[in-house]
């Protein structure tokens, strides 16, 4: 293992980054023992500077963080825990991540581009589960899988036509429709977009 550079208190900052969405969930600190426990158990452990003790994230709240990988920065004085966040909340306030405000104190409402597809699939699943009356997605799904797949095919054809016409704005618009219906198709098929991304990673060279 690399020789980490701890501060004068024997701590090192740790960023928890979501494996599925790529978003930064939280920032905390760990000492050598907390890192050891993380590696041994596969679940995120940190060191509480206020309580002066090691704590397992989610031990009481159930918001556990399964650690997929631990990464070290170039100066070896900071870590990233690449995690799968249980209950989809990381912040003690109930927010999905601890960075939910901008520098002016306003709540950040929109995800970053790389978060969009997995976050959008979460919204789609919620609409399907709730069977919302005014939801286009819920209405589409209520017509059956075949109709969902047909709609995806229609949007794919419209995207292809836009590409052939070479009109950038139309391509972007139609691609968004296609991706949305693709996510609906995956959702009704019980497939997470993460699994598609993992297949792309497998092919990455």
UniProtKB/Swiss-Prot annotation:
Its EC number is 3.5.4.19, 3.6.1.31. It holds the Pfam family PRA-CH. Signal peptide: none annotated. One of its GO terms (molecular function) is ATP binding. It is an enzyme of class 3 (hydrolase). GO terms for cellular component: cytoplasm. It catalyses: 1-(5-phospho-beta-D-ribosyl)-ATP + H2O = 1-(5-phospho-beta-D-ribosyl)-5'-AMP + diphosphate + H(+); 1-(5-phospho-beta-D-ribosyl)-5'-AMP + H2O = 1-(5-phospho-beta-D-ribosyl)-5-[(5-phospho-beta-D-ribosylamino)methylideneamino]imidazole-4-carboxamide. The keyword Nucleotide-binding applies. SUPFAM superfamilies: all-alpha NTP pyrophosphatases, HisI-like. Keywords: Amino-acid biosynthesis, ATP-binding, Cytoplasm, Histidine biosynthesis, Hydrolase, Multifunctional enzyme, Nucleotide-binding. Its main location: cytoplasm. InterPro entries: His_synth_HisIE, HisE, PRA-CH, PRib-ATP_PPHydrolase-like, PRib_AMP_CycHydrolase_dom, PRib_AMP_CycHydrolase_sf. Pathway: Amino-acid biosynthesis; L-histidine biosynthesis; L-histidine from 5-phospho-alpha-D-ribose 1-diphosphate: step 2/9; Amino-acid biosynthesis; L-histidine biosynthesis; L-histidine from 5-phospho-alpha-D-ribose 1-diphosphate: step 3/9. It is found in: Cytoplasm. Residues 1-116 are annotated as: Phosphoribosyl-AMP cyclohydrolase. Residues 117-205 are annotated as: Phosphoribosyl-ATP pyrophosphohydrolase. GO terms for biological process: L-histidine biosynthetic process. HAMAP family: HisE, HisI, HisIE. In the N-terminal section; belongs to the PRA-CH family. This is Histidine biosynthesis bifunctional protein HisIE. The gene is hisI.
